[in-house]
Curated annotation (Swiss-Prot):
Gene3D superfamilies: Na+/H+ antiporter like domain. GO terms for biological process: regulation of pH. It is a multi-pass membrane protein. The gene is nhaA. Na(+)/H(+) antiporter that extrudes sodium in exchange for external protons. Its main location: membrane. GO terms for cellular component: plasma membrane. The chain crosses the membrane at residues 17-37, 59-79, 95-115, 124-144, 154-174, 177-197, 213-233, 261-281, 287-307, 328-348, 363-383. NCBIfam families: NhaA, PRK09560.1, PRK09561.1. It comes from Shewanella sp. (strain MR-7). GO terms for molecular function: sodium:proton antiporter activity. It is found in: Cell inner membrane. Keywords: Antiport, Cell inner membrane, Cell membrane, Ion transport, Membrane, Sodium, Sodium transport, Transmembrane, Transmembrane helix, Transport. This is Na(+)/H(+) antiporter NhaA.
Length: 389
């Protein structure tokens, strides 16, 4: 298990560097003479027509609705594996990261709402600081190599996965609008078909892919966010076949490099370009960016630590063997790396609002995530032994 986790984290480390490059490139283009080219490229209309079906969207929405559906497919596969066989497969293993994740979502959301109380437009962004970027957080931890105990890596992985599950629920409940009954019926039929394939023991991925595409289009047209289709597909793909092979893990391993080295960097490049030229100091310290940045920098670690400590003291959970609070605390700080997940929620929260709010949300996310990453990295580096364990 240790070797598998280290291989996974080494890939995430390289992906984290690529994410930083994508963000830097986006910021450079958005604040240079290339800004018009950058915005024009993302606004390019892309049309797909098959018979009566006509999908016509800007490139940015194809990235956010299409590529990110594949990312959520991967997240769904990871969640299912961990729930059935991994770090979340027993109550004892799942208790501490579950309480930590709940605290790490509630407190940041509360801080954001505190700064944005009374403004119905900006209050829609309450979930932005509640997210953790699993790829980036694990990538930062991976920079410390073998100095990090495996139990600590598993704790962060489990916490981040539960956090992702919470984000999925939030998107389904709070960011779905103008529902289409016909599209939901078609989506339901596709889901029934996927479940039937699972119950019949079908392990070939092609049938799931065909029905999954139907489901994605139906969900896209339904008013429910299309990324949820990826999660549903993931939960329907069998974890184990009769011969002991794992179709789910095979697909997960196939998707990982695409997600790490293409999907997330492209998403970051498309969404991280914030034009700073028209922003005044008053704008930069307005409730949206401040609420998000403080939610990530302070709310995340406070929430994770508070709920974890309470759960242990109430004997609802226990610390992993060989791990103390001095190791948990910097990991809690790393959970404030919202980055791509926070930007994704921001794109949903302010989709119908003035574009300025989206820019402010992305700026707050960048500031909060970068500071959380630096604090988490240097703090964890200080408390860990100098040599590998």
């Amino acid at each position: 298990m240790e070797k598998a986790i280290r291989n996974f984290l080494s890939q995430e480390s390289a992906g984290g560097i690529l994410l930083l490059v994508a963000v830097a490139l986006a910021m450079l283009m958005a604040n240079s003479p290339l800004a018009g080219l950058y915005q024009g490229f993302l606004g390019t209309e892309v049309q797909v027509r098959v018979g009566a079906l006509d999908l016509h969207k800007p490139l940015l929405l194809w990235i956010n609705d299409g590529l990110m559906a594949l990312f959520f497919l991967l997240i769904g596969l990871e969640v299912k594996r961990e729930l059935l066989e991994g770090a979340l497969s027993s109550v004892a293993q799942a208790s501490l990261p579950t309480f930590a994740a709940i605290g790490g979502m509630l407190v940041p959301a509360g801080i954001y709402l505190l700064f944005n109380y009374g403004d119905p437009v900006t209050q829609a962004g309450w979930a932005i600081p509640a997210a953790t970027d699993i790829a980036f957080a694990l990538g930062i931890m991976a920079l410390l190599g073998s100095r990090v105990p495996v139990a600590l890596k598993v704790f962060l992985l489990a916490l981040a996965i539960i956090d992702d599950l919470g984000v999925i629920v939030i998107i389904a409940l709070f960011y779905s609008t103008d529902l289409s009954t016909i599209s939901l019926i078609i989506a339901s039929i596709a889901i029934v078909g996927l479940v039937a394939l699972n119950r019949k023991g079908v392990t070939a991925l092609a049938p799931y892919g065909v029905l999954g595409l139907v489901l994605w289009v139906a969900v896209l047209k339904s008013g429910v966010h299309a990324t949820l289709a990826g999660v549903i597909i993931a939960f329907c793909i069998p974890l184990r076949a009769k011969d002991g092979s794992s179709p789910s893990e095979h697909l997960e391993h196939s998707l990982h490099p695409w997600s790490t080295f293409l999907i997330l960097p492209v998403f970051a490049f498309a969404n991280a370009g914030v034009a700073l030229g028209n922003m005044s100091l008053n704008t930069l310290i307005s409730p949206v960016p401040v609420g998000i940045a403080l939610g990530l920098m302070l709310g995340k670690p406070i929430g994770v630590m508070l709920f974890s400590y309470a759960a242990v003291k109430l004997r609802l959970a226990q610390l992993p063997n060989g791990i103390g609070w001095k190791q948990i605390a910097p990991v809690a700080a790393m959970c404030g790396i919202g980055f791509t997940m926070s930007m994704f929620i921001a794109s949903l929260a302010f989709e119908q609002a003035d574009p300025m709010y989206g820019d402010l949300a992305r700026l707050g996310t960048l500031i909060g995530s970068i500071i959380a990453a630096l604090i988490g990295y240097f703090w964890l580096s200080k408390v860990l032994p100098k040599q590998g364990v």
